[in-house]
């Protein structure tokens, strides 16, 4: 990384269409901090999971694995890997795969359920 390049942070987290949470919140915060967030949604929800009924859900595990492969092929290096909501075993495996592919990246694991 060149000294003037922003730090790249892989954000492995859910994306809620409604509700002030998840990737919708962390991406602009990291960007304002001068970082380059890279979104990797584990699951897409119609709303957040706290008190708004049962949200519609779209699993992102297959997309996530394909995206990780693409980033590796491009030679992308992450300075940090941040995890948020991991909706199941496949999403946990996705985070573990990212940790294996970028062992030098700082790991920030936020457990959410």
Language-model features: locations:
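Ribokinase/PfkB-type carbohydrate-kinase core domain
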Residues: 3-113
